[in-house]
């Protein structure tokens, strides 16, 4: 059966470069090494940034900051799909605006008078010698929202978070003890709306393959990996029908053995696959 969710045209993720150029991704905290967690500038470099001309800023970004990125995140170059994936994402400096790409599917389920709560998830890509893996979690059964379901690390954007990127990093640290030096964000996918009333912005990132998950016992029952190649293949993704709030509805689901990867998690992966297909 051909359903509308499989024929969605996603908006372009390309964003015109801002002027003046800035590496700031609004995750602003000076770490122990004297560098900002988000942009890898020193405090002095941040303070004098407004006094630099456009050429000086771009040179600093393309040389000094690029070298620091390679030094801090040495595992980045191990991701063979890095250039391909980065090219289809919204840049970190420009989180996607607007409604979720699946709004039309949920018009009769979402509150029209209330604003949706902002949330973020981390779509973690782990470069392994055997191929890139996608890091997933299974939530504990006792959680209020989506208990027992397979999901990405993430949650609601809190007041003190530095936007959706800050929320995704914080939640990943809280849920599975993913440290700042073990994750290198690449960019954003399109926002996705959930029946529980959240506008979810997926943050795609590379995770250090030496990272060892430590799941929070109150939130995460299990952490596991699935091959990226499997999840990006149309062969393994299907639509299933289910009864929900009075009518038959269609949801996406993977045929992965041992875990049910479906719903919002499957839809976010589908969004990434479609974007990659558009530039293939």
Set out the residue ranges of the language-model regions.
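Short cysteine/histidine-rich metal-coordination sites, predominantly Zn2+-binding motifs
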Residues: 41, 50-60
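A broadly conserved sequence feature marking short terminus-proximal activation segments
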Residues: 1-12
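Short, intrinsically disordered, charge-biased short linear motifs at domain edges
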Residues: 10-15, 21-29
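Local cysteine-cluster metal-coordination motifs and their immediate loop/turn environment
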Residues: 23-44
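Compact, charge-rich alpha-helical regulatory domains located at protein termini
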Residues: 21, 46-47, 71
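N-terminal leader/linker segments that precede catalytic domains of diphosphate-processing enzymes
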Residues: 8-9, 66-151, 156-211, 244-280
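NUDIX/MutT-family hydrolases
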Residues: 215-257
């Amino acid at each position: 059966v051909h359903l509308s969710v499989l024929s969605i045209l996603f908006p372009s993720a390309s964003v015109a470069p801002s002027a003046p150029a800035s590496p700031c991704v609004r995750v602003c905290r000076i770490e122990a090494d004297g560098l900002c967690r988000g942009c890898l500038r020193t405090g002095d470099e941040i303070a004098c940034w407004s006094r630099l001309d456009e050429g000086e800023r771009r040179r600093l970004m393309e040389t000094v900051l690029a070298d620091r990125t390679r030094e801090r995140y040495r595992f980045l170059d191990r991701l063979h799909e890095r250039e391909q994936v980065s090219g289809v994402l919204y840049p970190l400096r420009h989180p996607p605006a607007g409604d979720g790409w699946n709004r039309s599917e949920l018009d009769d389920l979402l509150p029209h008078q209330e604003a949706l709560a902002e949330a973020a998830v981390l779509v973690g890509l782990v470069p392994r010698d055997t191929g890139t893996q996608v890091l997933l979690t299974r939530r504990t059964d006792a959680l209020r929202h989506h208990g027992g379901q397979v999901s990405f690390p993430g949650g609601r954007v809190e007041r003190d978070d530095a936007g959706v990127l800050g929320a995704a990093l914080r939640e990943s640290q809280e849920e599975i003890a993913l440290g700042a030096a073990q994750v290198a964000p690449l960019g954003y996918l399109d926002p996705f709306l959930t029946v529980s009333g959240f506008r979810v912005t997926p943050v795609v990132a590379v995770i250090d393959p030496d990272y060892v998950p430590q799941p929070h016992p109150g939130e995460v029952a299990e952490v596991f990996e699935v091959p990226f190649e499997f999840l990006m293949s149309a062969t393994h993704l299907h639509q299933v029908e289910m009864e929900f709030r009075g009518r038959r509805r269609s949801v996406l689901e993977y045929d992965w053995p041992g875990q049910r990867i479906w719903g919002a998690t499957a839809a976010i992966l589908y969004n990434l696959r479609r974007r990659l297909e558009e530039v293939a």
